[in-house]
Amino acid sequence: MAITIVVLGISSLTTLNSFVVRNQRRSAERAEAIKFSQESMEWFKIMRQRLSWDAFYQVLLADGSPGVYCLTVLPQEMGEFINLANRACDQDEDEILGRPFLREIHYTLPDPDTIVVRVLVRWTDGTQELTTESTSTIKKWNEQ
């Protein structure tokens, strides 16, 4: 009887330990995904600042609305931004820097003075697909 209680106790501790470890890993991955999402939103706004509103809007309009960019890295050169392909990420090819995350910037152009941006960062934990999402509306302002 005592052996059974000890075995059950050890089994319970092992299960609890693996549950805690899995939750810690999932929390760390979620924090990293949120960081990628925030960086991506800031990058998109920086690209808008580097170009005039009209030039930035025209790049997006030329790619089509709604549009989506898959970003394994955040391009720093304007030419790289302008030449981004309007496409969703491929699970097998488009992970961020060897990390298990896919990053997409979705945008719509509801009118010539507005861009709605949605950043999705996705990853898989076992068989479960997880996602972080952030959304922002960018408005044209007077450029003087």
Where are the regions a protein language model picked out?
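Aliphatic-rich helix starts adjacent to a transmembrane/signal segment
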Residues: 1-38
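Low-complexity, Gly/Pro-rich coil/beta segments used as flexible assembly/activation regions
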Residues: 28-144
